[in-house]
Protein backbone atom coordinates (compact mmCIF):
# COMPACT_ATOMS: atom_id res chain seq x y z
CA UNK A 1 0.00 0.00 0.00
CA UNK A 2 1.46 3.36 -1.03
CA UNK A 3 1.60 6.18 1.47
CA UNK A 4 0.96 9.68 0.21
CA UNK A 5 1.56 13.12 1.79
CA UNK A 6 -0.40 13.83 4.94
CA UNK A 7 -0.08 10.29 6.25
CA UNK A 8 -2.95 9.08 4.07
CA UNK A 9 -2.69 5.66 2.52
CA UNK A 10 -3.73 5.00 -1.04
CA UNK A 11 -6.35 2.29 -1.42
CA UNK A 12 -5.05 -0.58 -3.59
CA UNK A 13 -7.01 -1.83 -6.55
CA UNK A 14 -9.37 -4.70 -5.90
CA UNK A 15 -9.03 -7.95 -7.83
CA UNK A 16 -12.03 -7.01 -9.96
CA UNK A 17 -10.40 -3.71 -10.91
CA UNK A 18 -7.13 -5.34 -12.06
CA UNK A 19 -7.35 -6.08 -15.79
CA UNK A 20 -6.94 -9.67 -16.88
CA UNK A 21 -4.01 -10.66 -19.13
CA UNK A 22 -6.36 -10.66 -22.12
CA UNK A 23 -7.70 -7.22 -21.26
CA UNK A 24 -4.15 -5.91 -20.95
CA UNK A 25 -3.42 -6.83 -24.55
CA UNK A 26 -6.45 -4.92 -25.82
CA UNK A 27 -6.53 -1.17 -26.20
CA UNK A 28 -9.14 1.06 -24.63
CA UNK A 29 -11.65 2.61 -27.04
CA UNK A 30 -10.27 5.82 -28.58
CA UNK A 31 -11.00 8.93 -26.51
CA UNK A 32 -11.80 12.07 -28.44
CA UNK A 33 -12.10 15.69 -27.32
CA UNK A 34 -13.11 18.29 -29.92
CA UNK A 35 -13.33 22.07 -29.77
CA UNK A 36 -14.92 24.11 -32.53
CA UNK A 37 -17.42 26.90 -33.03
CA UNK A 38 -18.86 28.57 -29.93
CA UNK A 39 -17.15 26.13 -27.56
CA UNK A 40 -13.75 26.96 -29.04
CA UNK A 41 -14.41 30.68 -28.66
CA UNK A 42 -15.39 30.12 -25.02
CA UNK A 43 -12.15 28.28 -24.23
CA UNK A 44 -10.12 30.97 -26.00
CA UNK A 45 -11.81 33.62 -23.83
CA UNK A 46 -11.08 31.58 -20.71
CA UNK A 47 -7.37 31.32 -21.52
CA UNK A 48 -6.98 34.89 -22.81
CA UNK A 49 -6.17 36.50 -19.41
CA UNK A 50 -3.84 33.64 -18.46
CA UNK A 51 -1.43 34.31 -21.33
CA UNK A 52 1.64 32.09 -20.79
CA UNK A 53 1.04 31.34 -17.12
CA UNK A 54 -0.23 27.79 -17.61
CA UNK A 55 1.82 26.60 -20.59
CA UNK A 56 3.88 24.25 -18.41
CA UNK A 57 1.08 22.47 -16.55
CA UNK A 58 -0.21 19.05 -15.64
CA UNK A 59 -3.38 18.00 -17.47
CA UNK A 60 -5.58 15.53 -15.58
CA UNK A 61 -8.16 14.11 -17.99
CA UNK A 62 -11.18 12.06 -16.96
CA UNK A 63 -14.81 11.46 -17.71
CA UNK A 64 -15.87 14.72 -16.01
CA UNK A 65 -13.52 17.04 -17.84
CA UNK A 66 -9.96 18.33 -17.83
CA UNK A 67 -8.15 19.83 -14.87
CA UNK A 68 -5.20 22.14 -15.53
CA UNK A 69 -2.90 22.15 -12.50
CA UNK A 70 0.11 24.41 -12.07
CA UNK A 71 2.17 26.23 -9.47
CA UNK A 72 2.82 29.98 -9.77
CA UNK A 73 5.26 31.56 -7.31
CA UNK A 74 4.96 28.38 -5.26
CA UNK A 75 1.17 28.60 -4.93
CA UNK A 76 -1.20 25.93 -6.25
CA UNK A 77 -3.36 27.00 -9.21
CA UNK A 78 -6.26 25.02 -10.69
CA UNK A 79 -8.28 25.62 -13.85
CA UNK A 80 -11.19 23.18 -14.32
CA UNK A 81 -12.69 22.65 -17.77
CA UNK A 82 -15.97 20.76 -17.54
CA UNK A 83 -16.87 18.28 -20.27
CA UNK A 84 -19.87 20.46 -21.18
CA UNK A 85 -17.47 23.20 -22.35
CA UNK A 86 -16.32 21.06 -25.29
CA UNK A 87 -18.04 20.45 -28.62
CA UNK A 88 -17.48 16.70 -28.27
CA UNK A 89 -16.18 14.87 -25.23
CA UNK A 90 -15.85 11.09 -25.29
CA UNK A 91 -13.76 9.42 -22.61
CA UNK A 92 -13.27 5.79 -21.60
CA UNK A 93 -10.96 4.17 -19.11
CA UNK A 94 -9.26 5.48 -15.98
CA UNK A 95 -8.16 9.04 -15.38
CA UNK A 96 -4.99 10.01 -17.24
CA UNK A 97 -2.34 12.67 -16.68
CA UNK A 98 -0.20 14.40 -19.30
CA UNK A 99 2.48 17.05 -19.05
CA UNK A 100 1.49 19.89 -21.35
CA UNK A 101 5.03 20.92 -22.25
CA UNK A 102 6.24 19.12 -25.38
CA UNK A 103 9.60 20.80 -25.88
CA UNK A 104 11.22 24.06 -24.86
CA UNK A 105 8.99 26.10 -27.17
CA UNK A 106 5.72 24.26 -27.67
CA UNK A 107 2.95 23.18 -25.34
CA UNK A 108 -0.41 21.47 -25.69
CA UNK A 109 -1.93 24.69 -24.35
CA UNK A 110 -0.07 27.00 -26.74
CA UNK A 111 -2.94 26.72 -29.20
CA UNK A 112 -5.13 28.70 -26.80
CA UNK A 113 -2.78 31.68 -26.59
CA UNK A 114 -4.13 34.93 -27.95
CA UNK A 115 -3.32 35.45 -31.65
CA UNK A 116 -1.37 32.19 -31.82
CA UNK A 117 -3.57 31.06 -34.73
CA UNK A 118 -5.80 33.96 -35.86
CA UNK A 119 -7.93 31.71 -38.08
CA UNK A 120 -8.18 28.76 -35.70
CA UNK A 121 -11.08 26.54 -36.76
CA UNK A 122 -10.86 23.29 -34.81
CA UNK A 123 -8.80 21.60 -32.08
CA UNK A 124 -8.92 17.84 -31.61
CA UNK A 125 -7.36 15.68 -28.90
CA UNK A 126 -7.30 11.93 -29.44
CA UNK A 127 -6.13 9.45 -26.79
CA UNK A 128 -5.37 5.90 -27.89
CA UNK A 129 -3.64 2.88 -26.43
CA UNK A 130 -3.71 0.93 -23.22
CA UNK A 131 -3.51 2.51 -19.77
CA UNK A 132 -1.10 3.49 -18.37
CA UNK A 133 0.75 3.75 -21.70
CA UNK A 134 -1.74 5.82 -23.68
CA UNK A 135 -0.78 8.43 -26.25
CA UNK A 136 -2.39 11.83 -26.75
CA UNK A 137 -2.30 13.43 -30.19
CA UNK A 138 -3.32 17.06 -30.71
CA UNK A 139 -4.34 18.21 -34.19
CA UNK A 140 -5.48 21.68 -35.23
CA UNK A 141 -7.29 23.12 -38.24
CA UNK A 142 -7.33 26.69 -39.51
CA UNK A 143 -9.41 28.48 -42.13
CA UNK A 144 -7.87 28.65 -45.59
CA UNK A 145 -8.27 31.55 -48.01
CA UNK A 146 -11.18 29.81 -49.72
CA UNK A 147 -12.99 29.40 -46.39
CA UNK A 148 -12.34 25.67 -46.06
CA UNK A 149 -10.80 24.08 -42.98
CA UNK A 150 -7.24 22.88 -43.51
CA UNK A 151 -5.19 20.83 -41.08
CA UNK A 152 -1.77 22.11 -40.04
CA UNK A 153 0.15 18.86 -40.06
CA UNK A 154 3.35 20.55 -38.92
CA UNK A 155 1.62 21.66 -35.70
CA UNK A 156 0.54 18.16 -34.65
CA UNK A 157 1.79 17.35 -31.15
CA UNK A 158 2.07 13.97 -29.41
CA UNK A 159 2.41 13.29 -25.71
CA UNK A 160 2.77 10.08 -23.68
CA UNK A 161 0.73 9.44 -20.55
CA UNK A 162 2.44 9.68 -17.18
CA UNK A 163 2.71 6.18 -15.75
CA UNK A 164 2.96 7.43 -12.17
CA UNK A 165 1.53 10.65 -10.79
CA UNK A 166 -0.22 12.12 -7.76
CA UNK A 167 -2.33 15.27 -7.52
CA UNK A 168 -3.88 16.47 -4.26
CA UNK A 169 -6.98 18.61 -4.63
CA UNK A 170 -8.59 20.57 -1.80
CA UNK A 171 -12.26 19.76 -1.60
CA UNK A 172 -15.39 20.44 0.42
CA UNK A 173 -17.65 23.39 1.02
CA UNK A 174 -16.01 26.57 2.35
CA UNK A 175 -16.85 27.68 5.88
CA UNK A 176 -17.24 31.28 4.69
CA UNK A 177 -17.18 32.74 1.21
CA UNK A 178 -17.36 36.35 0.06
CA UNK A 179 -17.84 37.65 -3.49
CA UNK A 180 -15.83 40.72 -4.44
CA UNK A 181 -15.93 42.92 -7.51
CA UNK A 182 -12.78 43.84 -9.39
CA UNK A 183 -12.20 47.15 -7.52
CA UNK A 184 -12.89 45.46 -4.18
CA UNK A 185 -10.52 42.57 -4.84
CA UNK A 186 -7.87 45.01 -6.06
CA UNK A 187 -7.97 46.81 -2.71
CA UNK A 188 -7.64 43.53 -0.83
CA UNK A 189 -4.78 42.28 -2.99
CA UNK A 190 -2.88 45.56 -2.66
CA UNK A 191 -3.18 45.36 1.12
CA UNK A 192 -1.90 41.78 1.21
CA UNK A 193 0.95 42.50 -1.19
CA UNK A 194 2.70 45.09 0.98
CA UNK A 195 6.12 43.52 1.52
CA UNK A 196 6.99 45.87 4.38
CA UNK A 197 3.82 45.31 6.38
CA UNK A 198 3.29 41.57 6.63
CA UNK A 199 1.63 39.61 8.12
CA UNK A 200 -1.89 40.52 7.01
CA UNK A 201 -5.08 39.70 8.92
CA UNK A 202 -8.41 38.74 7.35
CA UNK A 203 -11.22 39.37 9.80
CA UNK A 204 -15.00 39.07 9.77
CA UNK A 205 -16.44 40.68 12.88
CA UNK A 206 -19.78 40.29 14.68
CA UNK A 207 -20.71 43.80 13.54
CA UNK A 208 -20.93 42.61 9.93
CA UNK A 209 -17.63 44.17 8.97
CA UNK A 210 -15.04 42.39 6.80
CA UNK A 211 -11.55 43.84 7.20
CA UNK A 212 -8.14 43.16 5.70
CA UNK A 213 -5.37 44.95 7.53
CA UNK A 214 -1.72 44.96 8.48
CA UNK A 215 0.64 47.43 10.11
CA UNK A 216 0.23 49.99 7.33
CA UNK A 217 -3.08 49.46 5.56
CA UNK A 218 -6.70 48.70 6.35
CA UNK A 219 -9.50 47.89 3.91
CA UNK A 220 -13.03 47.51 5.28
CA UNK A 221 -16.31 46.34 3.75
CA UNK A 222 -19.82 45.70 5.01
CA UNK A 223 -20.51 41.96 4.66
CA UNK A 224 -24.08 40.84 3.97
CA UNK A 225 -25.58 37.41 3.47
CA UNK A 226 -26.33 36.50 -0.13
CA UNK A 227 -30.04 36.86 -0.86
CA UNK A 228 -30.91 38.24 2.57
CA UNK A 229 -33.86 40.64 2.35
CA UNK A 230 -33.00 42.49 5.52
CA UNK A 231 -30.36 42.13 8.16
CA UNK A 232 -31.27 41.31 11.73
CA UNK A 233 -28.14 42.98 13.05
CA UNK A 234 -28.65 46.57 14.14
CA UNK A 235 -24.96 47.27 13.62
CA UNK A 236 -25.11 46.11 10.00
CA UNK A 237 -28.11 48.37 9.39
CA UNK A 238 -26.30 51.32 10.95
CA UNK A 239 -23.20 50.66 8.88
CA UNK A 240 -25.18 50.25 5.67
CA UNK A 241 -27.18 53.42 6.33
CA UNK A 242 -24.02 55.39 6.94
CA UNK A 243 -22.52 54.14 3.71
CA UNK A 244 -25.64 55.06 1.75
CA UNK A 245 -25.23 58.68 2.82
CA UNK A 246 -22.35 58.91 0.39
CA UNK A 247 -24.57 57.69 -2.43
CA UNK A 248 -25.78 54.34 -3.72
CA UNK A 249 -22.65 53.80 -5.77
CA UNK A 250 -20.44 54.27 -2.74
CA UNK A 251 -22.63 51.91 -0.72
CA UNK A 252 -22.35 49.21 -3.36
CA UNK A 253 -18.59 49.67 -3.49
CA UNK A 254 -18.42 49.17 0.26
CA UNK A 255 -20.70 46.10 0.44
CA UNK A 256 -19.68 42.50 -0.21
CA UNK A 257 -22.07 39.57 -0.35
CA UNK A 258 -21.44 35.99 0.57
CA UNK A 259 -22.50 32.92 2.49
CA UNK A 260 -22.22 32.17 6.22
CA UNK A 261 -21.29 35.76 6.98
CA UNK A 262 -22.47 35.18 10.57
CA UNK A 263 -19.40 33.02 11.18
CA UNK A 264 -16.91 35.47 12.63
CA UNK A 265 -13.23 34.72 12.26
CA UNK A 266 -9.77 36.23 12.33
CA UNK A 267 -6.97 34.60 10.36
CA UNK A 268 -3.45 35.60 9.37
CA UNK A 269 -1.66 35.10 6.07
CA UNK A 270 2.08 35.64 6.18
CA UNK A 271 2.78 35.14 2.49
CA UNK A 272 2.89 38.11 0.14
CA UNK A 273 2.68 36.08 -3.07
CA UNK A 274 -1.09 36.54 -3.35
CA UNK A 275 -0.80 39.82 -5.23
CA UNK A 276 1.87 38.44 -7.58
CA UNK A 277 -0.14 35.30 -8.35
CA UNK A 278 -3.45 37.07 -8.97
CA UNK A 279 -1.78 39.70 -11.13
CA UNK A 280 -0.07 37.01 -13.18
CA UNK A 281 -3.43 35.31 -13.67
CA UNK A 282 -5.08 38.70 -14.37
CA UNK A 283 -7.88 37.95 -11.94
CA UNK A 284 -10.51 40.70 -11.89
CA UNK A 285 -13.44 40.03 -9.61
CA UNK A 286 -13.43 36.88 -7.55
CA UNK A 287 -14.72 34.88 -4.62
CA UNK A 288 -12.80 34.46 -1.37
CA UNK A 289 -13.43 30.98 0.03
CA UNK A 290 -12.21 30.43 3.58
CA UNK A 291 -11.58 26.86 4.75
CA UNK A 292 -11.01 27.42 8.44
CA UNK A 293 -11.78 24.12 10.18
CA UNK A 294 -9.21 22.03 8.32
CA UNK A 295 -5.92 20.90 9.84
CA UNK A 296 -4.22 23.33 7.47
CA UNK A 297 -6.61 26.28 6.95
CA UNK A 298 -6.54 28.02 3.61
CA UNK A 299 -8.19 30.68 1.51
CA UNK A 300 -9.05 30.01 -2.12
CA UNK A 301 -9.49 32.86 -4.60
CA UNK A 302 -11.67 31.86 -7.57
CA UNK A 303 -11.93 34.26 -10.50
CA UNK A 304 -15.30 35.23 -11.92
CA UNK A 305 -15.95 35.29 -15.62
CA UNK A 306 -15.08 32.76 -18.31
CA UNK A 307 -11.81 31.69 -16.68
CA UNK A 308 -12.76 30.11 -13.35
CA UNK A 309 -9.13 29.76 -12.34
CA UNK A 310 -8.48 29.30 -8.62
CA UNK A 311 -5.41 29.87 -6.48
CA UNK A 312 -5.01 28.40 -2.98
CA UNK A 313 -3.11 30.21 -0.22
CA UNK A 314 -2.36 28.64 3.15
CA UNK A 315 -3.12 30.43 6.41
CA UNK A 316 -1.13 30.27 9.63
CA UNK A 317 -2.76 27.47 11.67
CA UNK A 318 -1.70 28.92 15.03
CA UNK A 319 -3.31 32.26 14.21
CA UNK A 320 -6.91 31.23 13.58
CA UNK A 321 -9.68 32.54 15.84
CA UNK A 322 -13.19 31.11 15.35
CA UNK A 323 -15.81 32.50 17.68
CA UNK A 324 -18.66 30.59 16.08
CA UNK A 325 -17.00 27.31 17.11
CA UNK A 326 -16.28 28.59 20.60
CA UNK A 327 -12.56 27.93 20.32
CA UNK A 328 -9.32 29.61 19.34
CA UNK A 329 -6.61 27.15 18.28
CA UNK A 330 -2.99 27.68 19.16
CA UNK A 331 -2.03 31.09 20.48
CA UNK A 332 -5.42 32.66 19.83
CA UNK A 333 -6.72 32.37 23.36
CA UNK A 334 -8.88 35.46 23.38
CA UNK A 335 -12.10 36.25 21.59
CA UNK A 336 -12.26 37.63 18.08
CA UNK A 337 -10.26 40.77 17.50
CA UNK A 338 -12.97 42.61 15.66
CA UNK A 339 -12.88 46.00 17.34
CA UNK A 340 -11.58 48.13 14.52
CA UNK A 341 -10.36 51.06 16.57
CA UNK A 342 -7.89 48.86 18.44
CA UNK A 343 -7.26 45.78 16.31
CA UNK A 344 -6.98 47.45 12.93
CA UNK A 345 -4.27 49.82 11.74
CA UNK A 346 -4.89 53.50 11.30
CA UNK A 347 -3.48 54.14 7.85
CA UNK A 348 -6.43 53.21 5.63
CA UNK A 349 -6.60 52.72 1.89
CA UNK A 350 -10.18 53.93 1.81
CA UNK A 351 -10.78 57.39 0.44
CA UNK A 352 -13.00 58.38 3.36
CA UNK A 353 -11.22 59.51 6.51
CA UNK A 354 -14.32 59.37 8.70
CA UNK A 355 -14.63 56.63 11.29
CA UNK A 356 -16.92 53.73 10.41
CA UNK A 357 -20.48 53.69 11.58
CA UNK A 358 -19.85 50.72 13.84
CA UNK A 359 -17.24 52.74 15.77
CA UNK A 360 -18.97 56.14 15.75
CA UNK A 361 -20.25 56.97 19.20
CA UNK A 362 -19.18 53.69 20.80
CA UNK A 363 -17.95 53.97 24.38
CA UNK A 364 -14.30 53.31 24.96
CA UNK A 365 -14.91 50.52 27.43
CA UNK A 366 -17.75 48.83 25.58
CA UNK A 367 -17.77 46.85 22.37
CA UNK A 368 -20.49 46.48 19.80
CA UNK A 369 -24.06 45.88 20.95
CA UNK A 370 -23.17 46.90 24.50
CA UNK A 371 -20.79 44.02 25.11
CA UNK A 372 -17.61 44.47 27.09
CA UNK A 373 -14.67 45.15 24.81
CA UNK A 374 -12.34 42.18 24.64
CA UNK A 375 -8.60 42.44 24.06
CA UNK A 376 -7.44 41.70 20.51
CA UNK A 377 -6.62 38.07 19.81
CA UNK A 378 -3.44 39.19 18.07
CA UNK A 379 -2.09 42.24 19.94
CA UNK A 380 0.46 44.52 18.39
CA UNK A 381 4.13 44.16 19.22
CA UNK A 382 5.12 46.15 22.31
CA UNK A 383 7.48 48.26 20.25
CA UNK A 384 4.72 49.90 18.19
CA UNK A 385 3.01 53.18 19.02
CA UNK A 386 -0.20 54.47 17.49
CA UNK A 387 -0.94 58.12 16.97
CA UNK A 388 -3.95 60.02 15.72
CA UNK A 389 -5.93 58.51 12.81
CA UNK A 390 -4.01 58.72 9.57
CA UNK A 391 -0.62 58.83 11.26
CA UNK A 392 2.15 56.41 10.45
CA UNK A 393 3.05 53.51 12.68
CA UNK A 394 6.30 54.46 14.41
CA UNK A 395 8.59 52.01 16.22
CA UNK A 396 9.10 52.94 19.85
CA UNK A 397 12.66 51.80 20.14
CA UNK A 398 15.27 50.69 17.64
CA UNK A 399 16.15 47.85 19.97
CA UNK A 400 12.68 46.37 19.51
CA UNK A 401 12.89 46.26 15.72
CA UNK A 402 12.87 42.88 14.11
CA UNK A 403 16.33 41.90 12.83
CA UNK A 404 16.81 41.98 9.11
CA UNK A 405 17.70 38.31 9.17
CA UNK A 406 15.45 35.77 10.75
CA UNK A 407 11.80 35.93 11.72
CA UNK A 408 10.14 36.24 15.10
CA UNK A 409 9.35 32.97 16.81
CA UNK A 410 5.82 31.81 16.11
CA UNK A 411 3.59 30.85 19.02
CA UNK A 412 3.58 27.19 19.89
CA UNK A 413 0.75 25.42 18.15
CA UNK A 414 -1.49 23.24 20.22
CA UNK A 415 -1.53 19.58 19.23
CA UNK A 416 -4.34 18.77 16.82
CA UNK A 417 -6.93 16.38 18.20
CA UNK A 418 -7.17 13.03 16.43
CA UNK A 419 -9.59 12.59 13.57
CA UNK A 420 -11.79 10.32 15.66
CA UNK A 421 -12.26 13.08 18.24
CA UNK A 422 -13.25 15.71 15.68
CA UNK A 423 -15.15 13.86 12.97
CA UNK A 424 -16.14 10.56 14.57
CA UNK A 425 -14.41 7.16 14.83
CA UNK A 426 -15.04 6.35 11.17
CA UNK A 427 -13.10 9.40 9.96
CA UNK A 428 -9.71 7.98 10.95
CA UNK A 429 -10.41 4.91 8.81
CA UNK A 430 -11.27 6.87 5.69
CA UNK A 431 -14.99 7.38 6.16
CA UNK A 432 -17.20 10.00 7.75
CA UNK A 433 -17.32 13.70 7.04
CA UNK A 434 -14.63 16.35 7.18
CA UNK A 435 -12.43 15.28 4.28
CA UNK A 436 -10.46 18.19 2.85
CA UNK A 437 -8.38 16.56 0.11
CA UNK A 438 -9.15 14.41 -2.88
CA UNK A 439 -6.48 12.59 -4.80
CA UNK A 440 -5.80 11.27 -8.27
CA UNK A 441 -2.89 8.90 -8.21
CA UNK A 442 -1.34 5.82 -9.78
CA UNK A 443 1.83 3.99 -8.81
CA UNK A 444 3.00 1.74 -11.61
CA UNK A 445 5.47 -0.24 -9.51
CA UNK A 446 3.11 -1.14 -6.69
CA UNK A 447 -0.07 -1.33 -8.77
CA UNK A 448 -1.89 1.02 -6.42
CA UNK A 449 -4.30 3.45 -8.03
CA UNK A 450 -7.25 5.62 -7.22
CA UNK A 451 -10.28 3.30 -7.21
CA UNK A 452 -12.49 5.88 -8.90
CA UNK A 453 -12.04 9.10 -10.90
CA UNK A 454 -12.36 11.04 -7.64
CA UNK A 455 -10.99 9.45 -4.47
CA UNK A 456 -11.05 11.15 -1.07
CA UNK A 457 -8.88 10.22 1.87
CA UNK A 458 -11.56 11.18 4.36
CA UNK A 459 -15.21 11.99 4.01
CA UNK A 460 -17.69 11.65 1.17
CA UNK A 461 -16.89 12.56 -2.39
CA UNK A 462 -17.45 16.26 -3.03
CA UNK A 463 -16.61 18.56 -5.91
CA UNK A 464 -13.26 20.09 -4.86
CA UNK A 465 -13.86 23.77 -4.11
CA UNK A 466 -17.04 23.49 -6.10
CA UNK A 467 -15.11 22.55 -9.24
CA UNK A 468 -16.50 20.19 -11.83
CA UNK A 469 -13.34 18.15 -11.87
CA UNK A 470 -12.61 14.87 -13.64
From Swiss-Prot:
It is found in: Host nucleus. Residues 1-13 have a biased composition (Low complexity). Its main location: host cell. Pfam families: Herpes_UL42. Residues 329-354 have a biased composition (Polar residues). Plays an essential role in viral DNA replication by acting as the polymerase accessory subunit. Associates with the viral polymerase to increase its processivity and forms high-affinity direct interactions with DNA. Facilitates the origin-binding protein loading onto DNA thus increasing its ability to assemble into a functional complex capable of unwinding duplex DNA. Interacts with the DNA polymerase catalytic subunit. Interacts with the origin-binding protein. This is DNA polymerase processivity factor.
Amino acid sequence: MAHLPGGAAAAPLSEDAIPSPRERTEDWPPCQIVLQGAELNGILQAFAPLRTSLLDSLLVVGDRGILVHNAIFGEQVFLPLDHSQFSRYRWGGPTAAFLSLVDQKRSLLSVFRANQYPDLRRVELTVTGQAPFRTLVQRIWTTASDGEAVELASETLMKRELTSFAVLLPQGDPDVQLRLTKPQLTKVVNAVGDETAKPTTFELGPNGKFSVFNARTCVTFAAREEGASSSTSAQVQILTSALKKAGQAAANAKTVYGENTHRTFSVVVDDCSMRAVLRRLQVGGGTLKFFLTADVPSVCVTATGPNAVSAVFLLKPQRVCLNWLGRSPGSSTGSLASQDSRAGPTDSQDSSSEPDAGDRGAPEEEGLEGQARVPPAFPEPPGTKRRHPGAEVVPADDATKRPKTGVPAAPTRAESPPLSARYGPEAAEGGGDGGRYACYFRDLQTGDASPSPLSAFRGPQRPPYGFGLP
